[in-house]
Each structure stands twice: as C-alpha cells, then as structure tokens.
C-alpha cells in the first residue's frame, strides 16, 4: 500500500509504501478467534539483548530470532517489556508470528505493594505518563497485522492509571488488551485473565473459570481468555513438566496459551574483553553476569533463555519444540501398522509435508521409508499406513520413529525440516537377569584390614566396609574412585529448597558394613554392603567374576521427602573419553523433560556431553540407559555397562560439587570422568522463579524403594561399538572453527551437521577414501550440535560441543 500526504493545496509533501494485512480478531466464549478459527498462542518472551552490543540488536540477530521461533513451533512473541523496533514487527508480519505488543511501562514497587491502591500506578500526577507510554505504542504499531494483543505494561500493580490507559487504547483500536496486573489486583483493566508462573492447579482453576483461595480477589469468574504471560522459567537446566502445562491448556475451557520466560540468555562480554578481543577461554564464551560487577544486581538471574546469548539451540528448546508441535501422533496400531494423526494447525493442511519413519532394533536403524501425507484439513484427524517389514527377534527391543517433514523450503527453514516427531515401542527390551560367564578362579584375601579379590587377569581391593579402592584388569587401572551411593545434585531450579538436608555435599551415610564370600567353586566373590544414613538406606550386592566383571544389584530405601537423586557414582580415569550409549538422546533429557528425545544408540565424548549453561550446574543426564561403552580411544580399553530396571546416567569431567561452586563455565578445568547411574532422579521442574515446585509424580517419594542392576564388564581391543555395529571409531575435534572427523571414511560416506533443533548447518561428502574430513563451522554459536554420519554399515548419530 502506498500512502501519500498532501498539503491544503493538494500538493504531495510525503509518500511511502508499506505492507498491510487484514484479519479478524474476536473473543467468543472466553477464547480468541482469528479469521474465525480458535487459536492457541505458543510463545516466549523476547528481550532486546546481544552479548556484544547489549540492548542494541542488529537486523541479522532479529531475523535469526524470528526464524528460530518458527523452527521451534512457536507462533507468538511477547515483547517483554517494551515494544520492539518497528522493523521487527515487519518480520513478524512476513514470517507469521503473532505479537503481544507491550508498552514500556514497569514499576516494581507498585507491583510488590500488591497493587490497586498504592504507588504511582494510583497517583493522578502520573496519569499522563502512563497514558503517553501506551498510546504512542499503539499509534506507531497499529498497522502491523501480526499484533494481536496490546499489553499495558508489566509488574506495576493494578491502580487506576491502568484504567485510564485501557480506555485510551480502546478508543484507538479494537484489539484485545492484556495486563497481568489487572488479574492480580482484581480490576477490569484487561480483556485477558493473565498470570505469571502459575501452579498447574492454578491453571486448572483459572483456565476453567474456577476461583481459589490464593488471594481474596483471585479467580477467573468472568470467563476471560486465560493466558500465562510468563511461565516455565528457563534459567539454567530447567523447563520441566512443560507437557503437563499444555495438557491443561488444551483440555481447558478458557486456556489460550502462554509465553515461556524467556528467549535468550542475557549474558554480556565485558567491555575490556571486547576491546582486547578476549572472547573465549578454552572454547567457552567468556560471558559475564551481574555477579561480576559491583552495585545492586541479581547475579545470574537474567540468564533465563531457551537459547544462549549468542543464540545456540539448547536441550530445553528441543523439548519446547516437541510440546508445541502442531501435528499430534495420537496412536499407532502395530497389528495394522496404522498411525493416527491429528492436524492441529489452524490454517494449514498436511499435503505440504511427508512422513519419514525408521525402525530401530536395540537402537540401530534397520529399516526406513517415506510416506506421502494426505491433504488432512486443519483440526482434522486421519490415518497413515506405514509399510515397514521389520519384525522383532527374541530379546531385541524394537522401536518405531516417525517424523513429519516439510516437502519444500520454507522462509524460515529448508526442505526436509522436521516439524513433529514421535516414537513407539514395537517390542519391549529384554528384562532377563544377567548371566555371568567369567572363566577362571578367584582368590579372596584379607589384607591390611580390608580385602583383595584377584584372578590371573584382575585385582580389586576393598576397605572392610565394602568401599572399593582399586580395580585393575590386565594391568590397567579402571577407576579413580569406586562405586558409592550418591544423592547430590545442584541445578538452579532446586535453589528454593536449598536449605533442605539433601543439599549437604556429603552423602549422609552414618553406618556402612560389608560381608565378603568366596563361592564354593571359586568362580565368583559375593560382597554384600548395607548402609544407612540421613537420606537413604541401601544395599549393594556385588558379584565379581574372574574376568574382572562386576554385577551390582542395588536396592535403595529413601528417607527424606525431597531427595534429588538416588543412585551411585564412580570416577573413571580422565582418558576414558569416548562414549557410545543406548538410551534416550542424543541431547540431555530428564524424567520431566524428555519430549523430542528418542531412544536410540548414540555416540559422543565425555567432553561433548557438557552443556554451556552460563552458571555451571548438574547436567548431561540421559534417561532409560540400556547399555554404555566408555573407553580410552587411544589405547582401546575401557568399561561396558549394561542395565536392568530404570537407570539414568551422566558423564562429565567435573563433579556436581565443582559445578555448583564454579561461577562461570569458562572457569572450569577438566578432570577425571565423573559418572552417575541413578535409579531415580527428581524432575527438573520450574523452581527458579515463582513457587512452582516439581510435580509430585516426578518426585522421589519419601519411603519409596528403588532397585536396579548394573553389569560392569572391562573391555580391551576396542575397534567397534557395542554389538559391533560400527566399522571403526569416528572421533570429532573442533580446530580453528572447523569440525574435524577422524576415522576410516569411504567414498560412499557422508556427514551432515545439525543444530539441536534439526536445522542443517553444514554437510560434506567423502570424495575419496580418507582418514580425516574437515567441515567449516565458522560463524556458528558455541553450543551442542548433532553430526549424522551415513556409512554403508549404517547411520550413526554423534553429539558434539562446538
């Protein structure tokens, strides 16, 4: 559209062109409709932030943010807590994001006073300033069709000045008006019933028009659209139980969605480091937080992002993408091979997508294929038949992965981009007890007040109470510290309960004893360890065989009501660097944040399991461990671990205590390999802001009993992975902005690098047989990436840390 301004004489004074759009917005029966379709708003709060330029954000970063929102299945931006540059509103229009445009108005003193009758929000002398800050936003932005809501401000109480701003905005524009403080103060300055950091019980109450006793004025009794303007506080290792929030919203009477707090970490580079070009330490961004500067600050509290300060995708965002996905895979009937699909897009049919499926046997892909999607209308269900032929063999776990992919390139992603995923179990894992086959005889000796178990190839030594002091096989030291009960975890979401006893940096064991028994046939030694303490009673039943294998049958009885983890830890040598595992992955996941993680066989290193959270904390967990190979890649020896029961694991070059005590990621020094094998771990939750505790179903119940089995088998001469599924070991290193892949590579092999959202960022094909291949990763933000290697022997998925 071209706009021309003329003077009184009819002469043209000024002309400009602008894009413009038309759409209808209506609130009906407590829900929001756009062009006649009910819409749920799946979003995040977006701040102006850049690690180099602070609050000045360049066009490239704006475009990147908008595209990443789309890639993560988000459709809504709340401009917390001020309007964006007008050019970014134009990006929302072009790429297709709904916007809650928020006025630059925030005064916490009024908010903290509880609102309606106190502070400047209620003083006549401030009326003009309140109205001015709001109406100038409307005047500037009202021609952007992407703006669906006006927001009057943030955390400023609910005084009468918001009544004036509401009236002024309503006189200018008919769009819905939002103000969270109105809900908090029980006033009528909002068309939306809005909350911050609600409990799930509050979502259920207020999204269904119920009242509660949290505040005397709380309760969505008018049946307004219910919106979580801030929720799922993404500080550090966070965003637990997001699925439950959306189950509640989608099943409610008035729920219309919410915006996660928030999009990007707000770390910055120090001015001196910028001047000196000193941006990294050992490959880690040298970011600063409030703790690095004098004066009032909130430490790390502004690092609440779903992406890093330089916009690297996080494991949290991958879970968000899964929960927000528009296409739901409702069920799969293995007998008929029929997949029931629901299209929850509001305006898009599914003929622009195709379905890709893969069958995995014990984590290894054995079959794949592609199926065309029918033209399924928005908000309709349909059935797709998957023509795979693979069948399960005895004891083999069989899984089915499905992915919905874009047929053509989008403005925000390339062709083949995956917008929705799901996984189904076709055959359960083997649960039979382990059969130990150690050949040779053992000797059990009492030495120096402890015990020694040895054979012709191995030796273990123990203290009298069962503590393992050494484990040597074929002359190789396999441990730095033997298995011990461990309950310690520290993430920022646990801070509200940090005063509880389980935050003691020791494991709280008060008594521990052991019995040692050599079997009559001398083929095994049995060690039974019983211990009790403040947090847990446990029994470890060790079975040791002559080849150096160790079977641990563990039973735990939990004492406290808020335990963080129940399991064991041990420390391996620092050069046990290479990792192959069969569990949920390839990125970090937890019991309440596993969406988008798929059970499969993955490859990485201990160094690459690290996640660059600005404030170091416990991390790297993988749920559902089946088996694991941890080894020294230079000398080809290490440890194989197999499990029975529910086991989660993590491997890092840092202890949890080291992570807690460190102020910055870039201050950490790599050490030995710290391994956790947990029977249970508390969910991550959302506790770093608001009284949002981990859901009961993701807690470790007080008095609960847990059990699992771990079989540790020393291995040597490693040239292939577990099950001999690889032809060779591939090793990845990042050197001068290049990813270097080392190993045997043939002409038929190819490599592709993806961020954790599935965006392909680099690829290379092998032109001739080689033992090294380089891929440039220049310009990519530091973070975790997925390398998919396709060889004649199969497809292998590696996680690397750039």
Please give the residue ranges for each predicted region:
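A short beta-turn/strand-edge loop motif at beta-sheet boundaries
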Residues: 346-353, 560-563, 743-750
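Extended substrate-binding grooves/exosites of carbohydrate-active enzymes
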Residues: 12-340, 346-351, 356-364
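A short tyrosine-centered beta-strand micro-motif
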Residues: 1-2, 398, 785-788
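C-terminal outer-membrane/trafficking sorting elements
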Residues: 724-802
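Terminal connector regions
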Residues: 3-5, 12-15, 390-430
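Short edge beta-strand/loop segments characteristic of extracellular beta-sandwich folds
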Residues: 338-346, 555, 738-744
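Beta-strand/loop-rich accessory regions of lumenal/periplasmic or secreted enzymes
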Residues: 387-395, 410, 424-717
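Intrinsically disordered, low-complexity Pro/Gly/Ser/Thr-rich segments with frequent PxxP/GP/PP motifs
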Residues: 363-396
């Amino acid at each position: 559209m071209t706009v021309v301004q003329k003077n009184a004489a009819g002469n043209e004074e000024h002309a400009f062109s602008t894009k413009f759009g038309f759409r209808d917005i209506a609130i009906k029966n407590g829900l929001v409709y756009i062009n006649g379709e009910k819409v749920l708003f799946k979003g995040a709060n977006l701040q102006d932030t850049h690690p180099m330029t602070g609050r000045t954000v360049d066009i490239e970063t704006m475009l990147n943010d908008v595209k990443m929102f789309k890639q993560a299945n988000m459709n809504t931006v709340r401009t917390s807590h001020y309007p964006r540059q007008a050019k970014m509103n134009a990006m929302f229009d072009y790429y297709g994001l709904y916007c809650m445009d928020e006025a630059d108005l925030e005064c916490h003193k009024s908010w903290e006073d509880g609102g309606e009758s106190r502070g400047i929000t209620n003083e006549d002398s401030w009326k003009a300033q309140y109205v001015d800050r709001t109406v100038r936003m409307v005047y500037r932005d009202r021609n952007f069709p992407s703006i669906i809501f006006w927001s009057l401000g943030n955390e400023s109480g609910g005084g009468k000045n918001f009544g004036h701003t509401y009236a002024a905005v309503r006189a200018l524009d008919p769009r819905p008006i939002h103000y969270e403080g109105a809900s908090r103060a029980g006033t009528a300055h909002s068309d939306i019933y809005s909350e911050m950091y609600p409990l799930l019980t509050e979502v259920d109450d207020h999204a269904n028009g119920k009242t509660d006793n949290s505040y005397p004025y709380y309760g969505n009794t008018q049946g307004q659209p219910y919106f979580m303007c801030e929720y799922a506080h993404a500080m550090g290792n966070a965003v637990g139980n997001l699925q439950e929030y959306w189950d509640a919203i989608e099943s409610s009477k008035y729920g219309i969605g919410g915006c996660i707090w928030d999009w990007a970490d707000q770390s910055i580079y120090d001015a001196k480091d910028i001047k000196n070009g000193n941006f990294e330490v050992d490959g880690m961004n040298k970011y600063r937080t409030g703790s690095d500067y004098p004066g009032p600050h909130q430490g790390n509290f502004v690092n609440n992002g779903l992406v890093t300060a330089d916009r690297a995708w996080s494991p949290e965002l991958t879970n968000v993408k899964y929960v927000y996905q528009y296409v739901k895979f409702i069920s799969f009937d293995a007998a008929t091979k029929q997949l029931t699909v629901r299209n929850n897009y509001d305006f898009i049919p599914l003929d622009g997508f195709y379905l890709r499926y893969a069958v995995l046997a014990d984590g290894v892909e054995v079959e794949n294929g592609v199926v065309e999607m029918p033209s399924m209308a928005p908000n309709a269900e349909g059935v797709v038949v998957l023509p795979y032929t693979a069948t399960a063999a005895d004891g083999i776990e069989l899984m089915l992965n499905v992915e919905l992919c874009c047929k053509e390139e989008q403005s925000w992603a390339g062709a083949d981009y995956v917008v929705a995923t799901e996984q189904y179990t076709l055959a359960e894992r083997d649960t039979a007890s382990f059969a130990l086959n150690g050949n040779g005889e053992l000797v059990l000796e009492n030495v120096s007040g402890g015990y020694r178990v040895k054979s012709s190839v191995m030796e273990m030594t123990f203290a009298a109470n069962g503590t393992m002091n050494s484990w040597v096989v074929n002359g190789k030291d396999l441990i730095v510290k033997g298995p011990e009960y461990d309950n310690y975890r520290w993430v920022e979401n646990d801070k509200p309960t940090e005063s509880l006893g389980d935050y003691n940096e020791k494991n709280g064991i008060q008594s521990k004893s052991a019995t040692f028994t050599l079997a009559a046939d001398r083929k095994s030694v049995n060690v039974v360890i019983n211990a009790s303490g403040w947090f847990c009673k446990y029994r470890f039943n060790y079975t040791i065989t002559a080849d150096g294998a160790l079977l641990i049958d563990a039973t735990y009885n939990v004492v406290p009501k808020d335990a963080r983890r129940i399991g064991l830890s041990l420390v391996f040598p620092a050069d046990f660097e290479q990792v192959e595992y069969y569990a949920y992955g390839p990125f970090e996941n937890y019991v309440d944040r596993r969406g988008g993680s798929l059970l499969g066989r993955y490859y990485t290193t201990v160094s690459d399991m690290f996640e660059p959270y600005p404030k170091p904390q416990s991390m790297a967990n993988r749920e559902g461990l089946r088996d694991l190979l941890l080894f020294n890649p230079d000398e080809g020896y290490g440890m194989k671990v197999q499990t029975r029961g529910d086991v989660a694991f993590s491997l890092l070059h840092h202890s949890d205590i080291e992570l807690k005590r460190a102020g910055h990621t870039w201050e950490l020094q790599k050490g030995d390999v710290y391994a956790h094998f947990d029977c249970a771990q508390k969910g991550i939750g959302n506790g770093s802001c608001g009284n949002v505790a981990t859901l009961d179903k993701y807690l470790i119940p007080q008095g609960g009993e847990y059990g699992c089995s771990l079989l540790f088998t020393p291995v040597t001469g490693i040239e292939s992975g577990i099950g001999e599924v690889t032809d060779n070991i591939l090793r990845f290193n990042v050197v001068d902005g290049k990813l270097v892949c080392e190993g045997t590579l043939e002409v038929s092999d190819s490599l592709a690098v993806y961020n954790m959202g599935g965006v392909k960022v680099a690829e290379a094909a092998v032109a001739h047989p080689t033992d090294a291949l380089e891929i440039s990763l220049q310009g990519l933000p530091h973070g975790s990436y997925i390398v998919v290697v396709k060889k004649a022997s199969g497809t292998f998925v590696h996680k690397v840390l750039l």
